[in-house]
Amino acid sequence: MASFGWKRKVGERVSKQTVQQFEQDSEQADEDEVEREGVDWLHVIKRKREVLLEDCAAKSKRLKEEGALLAEQDRNWEALKKWDEAVQLTPEDAVLYEMKSQVLITLGEVFLAVQSAEMATRLRPIWWEAWQTLGRAQLSLGEVELAVRSFQVALHLHPSERPLWEEDLNWALKLRENQQSLREKASQVDEARRLLVEAPELKGDYDFESDEVIEACSAMADRQKQYEDLKKKAVVVDAHGEAKEMLVEGDDNPTSSSQSVLIKARGL
């Protein structure tokens, strides 16, 4: 009869030293595998990010070019839509903001045009064309002093650009002079009105049979005539940007032998 005994455990005959060596080798292999996997994952993530950025840049470039073609066809709103999509992909592209500003000026959205041009100058502060576009947007908004400064910055960055001298800056300086003329005109009218209402000749006590009354009445008549003459004249800007005084028929209708020389605004 065969004797009964406990079954030996697996590995019972393996020495403890062999087991410990095996466990150490196994742990080292696991650590090496984890390390290799970690490096691989970082590389994969970095590569995916690079590919994503490349895809965004390529798509943004395509949208930019499509928008430029639409703008050349006067399909300005469609062009803006393309560029807005491109901005979402490449928000630090100053050219997109500058192009948007040009189209917004054309559409009369001058406040948005100024904002877009300002963003372009912040992203690329040494790009003279961005400053030129900002100056034109500011002119359209009526900010003549700011426009003069923007054109001066553009000229400082690119002094050889003749259109900046001959068109943009000269026009802005003329507008500034015209604004000064308008302010002086308004000041003269206000002063004439004040002297008419607060005439010092009316504050004295006169003998109605004396010559002082006649002199006071004559002075009042002169003030009245001066005030009316000032009201009959308006300062307008001709096609060459020159400010001129012209007679007006009513309160708001200037008259001239050549109405065609008058302009309301310069197309920038």
UniProtKB/Swiss-Prot annotation:
UniProt-listed InterPro entries: TPR-containing, TPR-like_helical_dom_sf, TPR_rpt
SUPFAM superfamilies tied to this protein: TPR-like (SSF48452)
Cystine connections: none
Alphabetically ordered keywords of this record: Repeat, TPR repeat
Keyword Cell membrane: no
SMART domains: TPR (SM00028)
Region of interest (Disordered), ranges: 14-34, 249-268
Chain positions of TPR repeats: 60-93, 94-127, 128-161
Stretches with biased composition (Acidic residues): 24-34
PANTHER family: OSMOSIS RESPONSIVE FACTOR, TETRATRICOPEPTIDE REPEAT PROTEIN 33
Protein name (database record): Tetratricopeptide repeat protein 33
Record organism: Danio rerio (Zebrafish)
Gene responsible for this protein: ttc33
